Amino acid sequence: ANPADEPKSIFISAVSTAPLGASHEFALQGREKEFQAGIDALSKLTKGQVHLSVQGIAGSFLNDINGVALHKVSGKHPAGNVGVQIANVDPVNAGEKVWCVHPQDVAAIGSLFLNGKYDPSRVIALTGSEVENPEYYSVIRGAMIEDLVVGKLKEGNVRLISGDPLTGSSVKRKGALGFYHDS
């Protein structure tokens, strides 16, 4: 995004419908204050609305975020795709700009304003049929794939993907986790 541009709105999709995608709800556990502070900061960057799409899980802190237009999304993929949400909620016309922010980046922005420090950590899901025990890990952005998978994969020829199987990128063991990826 060009910082000189003012977006007509900002979208955050906390809905993961892609296969083998990480749960945003799980990834944000313990970062509720940072997430709200990030929303507060983002709301100052647009005269329009900050849109937050959620799955509407009962008891989720995401249902109670202040300063957003809350959208409860359900259904199969691509329902969680932020582009689908924009097209249905606030379509972009010629010359207009809409910004999209990953939920964990909202928390990182909030952390910067609350603590004065950038937090490069990200919660990721190591998943797939060739993973011995699929689980979540807290890593630093750009973590080396080899460090993430050593001793965690089944024997044989394994295809490694940074991101989900539909939109991710094939990576080598010596490669790195994509900047925006959480699986």
Question: What is each model feature region?
Answer:
Residues A1-S183:
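Buried, small/hydrophobic-residue-enriched core segments of structured protein domains
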